[in-house]
Structures are given as structure tokens and as C-alpha cells.
């Protein structure tokens, strides 16, 4: 009788342990997904803020970065990201300069967002990393296109105040989104979903922006004869 009771308790303990492991696995996956989504989506807005914030959170808030993102904790990486963010912070507040900055960063933010997402899933199967790479690039593309299209609209205003306000709002959104990804992942999912809806609404302007980028690249590679 005692042996049966002991076996029953052992079985219950095993089931509890299995359930606990599954719950922990789900929570870890959600955390990884949130950081991957947050890092890639924010990269389309401010890549350097995304990298610097994640690195600083890991250093000072004991945030465990998933996969191979621990490379962001390097003081060299953090220092370079902060320095570039300072440059971007200034450039982003100047009309016309901000649009030129966005054109150049079309070739930086989107690939970087894809790499950050794939790196976050570094402990997963290679196929999962490829999927994360593709989806991360798509998220960075959507947020970058929305940012650039919004700036093109704002720059039509003759006064600089609106441009500065929009830029500061983007800075706050970038940092807050990374904080949500780290500590409140479900809210981050809602923010990204809202961002995708906004991207869909301004899709025609996003297409116009990327056509402009293509024309600029063609003009640079094939300058008109003088």
C-alpha cells in the first residue's frame, strides 16, 4: 500500500515537473519572440537605439538576451551604437537631411533587423532561424517604410517644429518598444500589430518612397552626362 502511494506521488511529481517545463518552454519562446520582433521592428525606426537599449538593459537590468544576442552586451558594440544614435538623433531633426538619412539607411536597417531576429533564435533549429530572418526583415521593412513615408509628408510643412516633434516621438517609441519586448512582451505584440496596421494604411506612400530610393541609386550609378 505504501509502495503504491509512493509511486502515485512520484507520478504526480513527474507530471507536475513536465507541466512546469512546458510552461517554462512556452514562456521562454514568447520572450525570445518578443525580443526578436521588438529588435527587428524597432530597427526600421532606429537601429542604433534598438542595439544600444538591448545592450544596456542586459548590462544594467540583468536582461537575459536570447540566442546569440549576447554579443550586444559588448561595451564596444554599445559604445558604437550610442555614438551612431547621437548622430542620428541630430540628423533626424533636420528637414531634408532626415530623408537623406532614411534613404541611406534603407540598405542598413532592413538587413540589420533580419539579422537581429535570426540571431535571437540562435538556439533554435536552422529552419527557424531562416524564418526569423525573413520575418524580421519584413518587420524592419514595414517600420522603416512607414517612418520614411511619414517624414516625406511632414517635410512638406515649412516650419521645423512638426519634424522635431515627430522625430522625438519616434525616439520614445523605439526605446519604449524595446522595454516592452524585454518586460511586457504581450504589450509589445500589440504595439507591433498597431504598427503593421499603420504601415498598411500608408502603403502607397511607402511604395513611392522606395521608388524614389531606386531612382536615387540609378542616378548615382549612372550619372547623366554633363
Question: How should each PLM-predicted stretch be described?
Answer:
Residues 69-76, 121-130, 148-159, 207-221:
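A cytosolic-side transmembrane-helix exit/cap motif
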Residues 81-91, 136-147, 198-204:
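Alpha-helical transmembrane segments of multi-pass membrane proteins
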Residues 38, 115-121, 147-154, 167, ...:
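Generic transmembrane alpha-helix signature in multi-pass membrane proteins
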Residues 111-120, 129-150, 172:
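Mid-bilayer segments of alpha-helical transmembrane spans in multi-pass integral membrane proteins
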Residues 19-21:
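Cysteine-centered motifs
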Amino acid at each position: 500500500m505504501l509502495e503504491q502511494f509512493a509511486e502515485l506521488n512520484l507520478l504526480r511529481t513527474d507530471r507536475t515537473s513536465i507541466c512546469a517545463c512546458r510552461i517554462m518552454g512556452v514562456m521562454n519562446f514568447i520572450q525570445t519572440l518578443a525580443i526578436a520582433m521588438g529588435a527587428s521592428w524597432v530597427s526600421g525606426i532606429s537601429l542604433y537605439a534598438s542595439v544600444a537599449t538591448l545592450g544596456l538593459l542586459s548590462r544594467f537590468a540583468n536582461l537575459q538576451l536570447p540566442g546569440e544576442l549576447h554579443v550586444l552586451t559588448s561595451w564596444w558594440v554599445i559604445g558604437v551604437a550610442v555614438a551612431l544614435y547621437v548622430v542620428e538623433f541630430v540628423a533626424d531633426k533636420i528637414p531634408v537631411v532626415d530623408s537623406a538619412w532614411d534613404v541611406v539607411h534603407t540598405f542598413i536597417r532592413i538587413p540589420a533587423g533580419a539579422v537581429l531576429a535570426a540571431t535571437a533564435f540562435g538556439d533554435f533549429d536552422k529552419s527557424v532561424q531562416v524564418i526569423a530572418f525573413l520575418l524580421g526583415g519584413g518587420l524592419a521593412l514595414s517600420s522603416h517604410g512607414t517612418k520614411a513615408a511619414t517624414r516625406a509628408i511632414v517635410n512638406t510643412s515649412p516650419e521645423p517644429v512638426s519634424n522635431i516633434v515627430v522625430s522625438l516621438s519616434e525616439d520614445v517609441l523605439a526605446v519604449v518598444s524595446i522595454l516592452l519586448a524585454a518586460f511586457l512582451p504581450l504589450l509589445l505584440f500589440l504595439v507591433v500589430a498597431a504598427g503593421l496596421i499603420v504601415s498598411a494604411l500608408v502603403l502607397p506612400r511607402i511604395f513611392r518612397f522606395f521608388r524614389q530610393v531606386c531612382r536615387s541609386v540609378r542616378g548615382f550609378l549612372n550619372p547623366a552626362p554633363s
